[in-house]
Amino acid sequence: MVSALYAVLSALLLMKFSFDVVRLRMQYRVAYGDGGFSELQSAIRIHGNAVEYIPIAIVLMLFMEMNGAETWMVHICGIVLLAGRLMHYYGFHHRLFRWRRSGMSATWCALLLMVLANLWYMPWELVFSLR
């Protein structure tokens, strides 16, 4: 399953973001909240934003693949999703709004493509079956 590749890569990305938060919490000795440190605030939001988008994207990608979408379509969506998350990280981390905006746009494009692919490949005869 191709979607497993993107689930694994996304999980690694989430782990990296999580480690960044933990490292900064230890550095600034902050157990709860952000302690008013902007670097920690950014790391928390980078991680939080990824947690908000990646899980639903992976579920959509898995359903898309299970519904019979072409393998190349799954790869395109996975690449756009990961590129978007990396651009968002880079833009947020370096305070470059253009990169952050581009990353969110790529993430939304990937989500929209997966929604449309799922609607297209949905086994509608089973969805509306009374059996």
Swiss-Prot record:
The chain crosses the membrane at residues 108-128. Its main location: membrane. It is found in: Cell inner membrane. Keywords: Cell inner membrane, Cell membrane, Membrane, Transmembrane, Transmembrane helix. GO terms for cellular component: membrane; plasma membrane. InterPro entries: MAPEG-like_dom_sf (IPR023352), Membr-assoc_MAPEG (IPR001129). Residues 1-107 are cytoplasmic. Residues 129-131 are periplasmic. It is a single-pass membrane protein. This is Inner membrane protein YecN. It comes from Escherichia coli (strain K12). The lineage of its organism: Bacteria, Pseudomonadati, Pseudomonadota, Gammaproteobacteria, Enterobacterales.
